Swiss-Prot record:
Belongs to the class-II aminoacyl-tRNA synthetase family. InterPro entries: aa-tRNA-synth_II (IPR006195), aa-tRNA-synth_II/BPL/LPL (IPR045864), Anticodon-bd (IPR004154), Anticodon-bd_dom_sf (IPR036621), His-tRNA-ligase (IPR015807), HisRS-like_core (IPR041715), HisRS/HisZ (IPR004516), HisRS_anticodon (IPR033656). This is Histidine--tRNA ligase. It comes from Thermotoga sp. (strain RQ2). It comes from the Bacteria.
Amino acid sequence: MKYRRIKGTNDIFGEEIWYWRYVEETFRNVCESAGIEEIRTPIFEQTELFVRSVGEESDIVQKEMYTFQDKAGRSITLRPEGTAPVVRAFLENSLIDRGFQQRYYYIGPMFRYEKPQSGRLRQFHQVGFEIIGPESPKADFEVIMLVDTFLRRLGLTKYKIHLNSIGCPVCRKNYREALKEYYGQVLDNLCDDCKRRYETNILRLLDCKVDHEYSLNAPKSVDYLCDSCRAHYKKLKEYLNTFEIEYVEDHTLVRGLDYYTRTVFEVRHEGLGAQSAIAGGGRYDGLFAELGGSSVPALGFAGGIERIILALKAEGIEIPMKNVHLVYIATLGEKAFMDGVRLAGELRKKGLSVDVDIMDRKLSGQLKHASRMGSRYAVIIGDEELEKGIVILRDLETGDQVEIDRDFAADYIAERVSKD
């Protein structure tokens, strides 16, 4: 029997891993330069956490969650998104005692049972952060600004930030009624999912890809905002305009999670076709209370690593790739091996990537392997070199080689490599 990876998952290795490291390290740097702390939560939680937070009638809960019973009979779900676990951790660990305006970022795998396609897998990976405490539109601005900073730091330019306000529970009531009246006139023409959502969560009709043409003429949420929500949205746009962060107002944007209030946004990249979203987020002021805590304003964002990497490739952005096989030490004989290990240790202390042969191959086999792995230099040590107190440094690209006094080998090699 041949074992294969599960459908909707991927193995990541070789040059591809450098794209992942580039995205993750850039994200960490942006977050930590803004004073955002890292948080790590379990990849599985109680199912009810996501039912309460994401929404019982959402597509995620209805169709996409990986849910199972553990041996104690508890319903467990692999996390489909990262916000609810952070809120749960915040409440459970009494992090509110640290005061308001707390900020946490995360990087990790999420799980949804969807049809696998380019950039959309069943195990996918996200970067994200949550800002807990501020109600001011300054916080909404900061989130969008940091997302824009992160994407530009990666080198991306061909994306647009879509922005909307879906109001608070008070003003959204009138908006729901307006949508009911509008869609009620065309209900027979809608897809089965939209007919179900008409009764359970009518805002989700705006996000339907099948009946998208109806959303173009649907009532706009911004026309039903209360004075407080309208002022919040206006101020957010003023901040974005002042700092020249470009955005597109998109009044069909609602996002796929039920916990959002007021600000919602989505980043779409022009190089990814129909599945163009690479990041999104918004405000979720009612989620803490919904999960059993006090009412705490909060907001955040998440970006799909797979999608962001596709965007990098679509723009042809070159990323830094470190050669982890920079120096290869080829040895002949037991004594030469022991000295090779010592030299490798000296070079690694100087920050070089060094590999030592442990296969007892002939010299030709060792050098062939070094070239195959992409090593730039080979250090050759045999009985003759030991007797002379030297090592040979060979440039595997040019074939040039030089004899080096063993006592100064580490310094010489480190200096030689630094000049390339």
